[in-house]
């Protein structure tokens, strides 16, 4: 009976170690407050939670350079649904046509397809709703790229 208990205990310990090692590669990616996917909305700097991601599985080299933003609106619904989490890589440049988190006027952020030509910045929605219009800014409006959209996590209700 003592031997049987030792075997049982050993199995439980081994299983626990295996479970821990299976999850040891997870990165707890921060989730920042909601972001507008319509007209730019106030940029929130608060972390509202964290979502575990497996950087290796997702092909992410530096997970600490990533964060999630909760999408609020329908202007990008062909790409990402309202309420979903947009995975963003922190970077200050993107190629024309890529989707970016853009800070407009220093205090409002939006998720849009980004294009820059000369001194003109174009932020374009990608929506099934024609109500959303392209936003065009000249050099008098401060524009700063906060990051590039690289993926999403959608919660099915």
Which ranges hold each PLM region?
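Short, positionally conserved secondary-structure boundary motifs
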Residues: 1-82, 109, 143, 151-157
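Glycine- and charge-enriched low-complexity intrinsically disordered segments
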Residues: 116-157
């Amino acid at each position: 009976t003592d031997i049987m208990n030792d075997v049982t205990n050993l199995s439980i310990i081994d299983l626990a170690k295996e479970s821990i090692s299976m999850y040891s590669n997870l990165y707890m990616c921060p989730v920042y407050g909601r972001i507008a996917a319509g007209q730019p909305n106030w940029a929130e700097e608060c972390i509202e939670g964290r979502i575990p991601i497996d950087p290796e599985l997702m092909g992410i080299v530096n997970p600490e350079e990533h964060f999630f933003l909760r999408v609020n609106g329908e202007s990008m619904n062909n790409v990402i649904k309202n309420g979903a989490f947009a995975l963003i890589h922190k970077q200050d440049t993107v190629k024309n046509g890529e989707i970016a988190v853009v800070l407009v006027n220093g205090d409002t952020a939006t998720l849009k397809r980004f294009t820059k030509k000369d001194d003109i910045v174009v932020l374009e929605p990608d929506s099934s709703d024609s109500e959303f219009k392209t936003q065009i800014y000249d050099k008098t409006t401060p524009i700063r790229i906060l990051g590039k959209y690289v993926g999403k996590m959608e919660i099915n209700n």
